A protein has these predicted regions:
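Generic structural signal for well-ordered, non-membrane alpha-helical segments
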Residues: 20, 24, 28, 40-43, ...
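Thiamine diphosphate
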Residues: 10-21, 25-31, 92-214
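Flexible, glycine/charged-enriched surface loops at secondary-structure junctions
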Residues: 37-50
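Active-site diphosphate/adenylate-binding microenvironment
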Residues: 48-125
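Short, polar loop motifs at secondary-structure junctions
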Residues: 3-9
Length: 214
């Protein structure tokens, strides 16, 4: 489904199944009316059954894992607003975060917008001054808008950044592994610390163990 006010933009990059030429506000109003009229009870039951048949697993015999990080986040920030960047950490977040309310998770799904997380988290904090805002990002995505640390300081928007630093563009490398015969290109960021925050005002640390994370 492609909604665009400009007819020339429809199917310009990707051929779409359902083209809708409309102002976004009008189209979204109609979509909301349609969505609210649907009974989702059966669909929710099916999802609950899938969860029972395919429970999430977590290894505990190999040091700190991404899954353990989210386990600790769930215990500590129950009412926080969570924001993800785009990458492997985004997949982990959507699987392992436990959400207690609507509008608690902000993510850019399926759009490949690396660098989205940190600026979006700053905006979420400005709009929710009374809540903690936790941004999950990777070393690749964070570097795309790393300059926004200065914005966060100037706007007095303290955001908690949880940075998964594996020295790779992890999801791109995974695609190269699965679909391109392990021909890796431009995905290794080499081993270095991505901790320039201390020179700009915020505090940064690299915890070696899971209990030290929080």
């Amino acid at each position: 489904v492609h909604i665009d006010v400009d007819t020339a933009s429809i199917s310009r990059n990707v051929v779409v199944d359902v083209p809708v030429v409309s102002d976004a506000n009008l189209a979204l109003e109609k979509l909301l009316e349609w969505a609210e009229s649907k009974d989702t009870e059966q669909w929710q039951k099916e999802i609950a059954e899938w969860d029972k048949k395919n429970p999430l697993e977590m290894r505990r015999d190999c040091g700190m894992t991404p899954q353990m990080v989210f386990e600790h986040v769930n215990r500590t920030f129950r009412e926080a607003v969570y924001v993800t960047d785009v990458g492997q950490h985004q997949m982990w977040a959507t699987q392992y975060l436990e959400l207690d309310s609507w509008h608690q998770l902000i993510t850019s799904g399926g759009l490949g917008t690396m660098g989205f997380g940190f600026p979006a988290a700053i905006g979420a904090k400005i709009g929710n001054r009374d809540k903690e805002v936790v941004c999950f990002t990777g070393d690749g995505g964070f570097q795309m808008n790393i300059q926004e640390m200065a914005t966060a300081v100037v706007q007095e928007a303290p955001v908690i950044i949880c940075l998964f630093n594996n020295y790779y563009l992890g999801m791109v490398r995974q695609m190269q592994q699965l679909f391109y015969g392990k021909r890796y290109e431009a995905t290794c960021l080499r081993r270095r610390r991505i901790c320039p925050a201390n020179c700009k005002g915020p505090n940064a640390s690299c915890p070696p163990h899971t209990p030290d994370f929080i």
